[in-house]
Amino acid sequence: MLRAIFYKEWLKTRWYYLVAVLLSLSFVGYVLLNFFRAAGLKGIAHLWEVMLLRDAVFVDLLQFVPLVVGLLFAVVQFVPEMQRKCLKLTLHLPCPELRMIGAMLLYGGLLLGGLFAVSLGVLFVAFRAVLAPELVRHILLTAAPWYAAGIAAYLLAAWICLEPTWRRRLLYGAVAACVLRLFFLAPAPEAYDGFLPWLTLCTLCTASWSWWSVVRFKEGRQD
């Protein structure tokens, strides 16, 4: 059954996911292109100096890319479920409802997690060729909360999309905005080092919120 659910979700999201992969990696490529162009013009030693003295990370352009990718993934995956009344049929399949919704969220989380891991992996390989391990770690730890925000945005947007009433959607949207703001409160590089485990836990906890919306949907709540 899990394979069937994954296949159903893949049919809905495959084209968006392809576009998301291309755009995400294009942004990563653009960041690296700018970095190596600057290295060619001014020398890699100058960039080392800038990173050490000015706390630069050279990946600021990526800050909101995972957030947008995760948000739109949830919209593409769950809005058709609500508009076409497919969720009611999905919940009547011979599979526990909680497991069904969990599988749908797991599908999205795995695809986004894979994309974000590849993006960070490309950054690691490219920067590791010319920078010290400590500087590479500095860059990746600075970017890590942004990618965690992408997963959180996906889970929170799913929670909102599955909610059957517009009044609650607006309320949930305000709550989601406050939660996502936590990932961008501190602009300084590596500002979240000590808080990163708590951000990860917060992200995982939001996965359960969609079940509240599904329960309300089953109860027939509507505007």
Where do the language-model regions lie?
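Secretory targeting signals
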Residues: S24, V28-L32, F36-A39, G43-G70, ...
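Helix-loop-helix units of permease transmembrane domains in multi-pass membrane transporters
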Residues: Q77-Y107
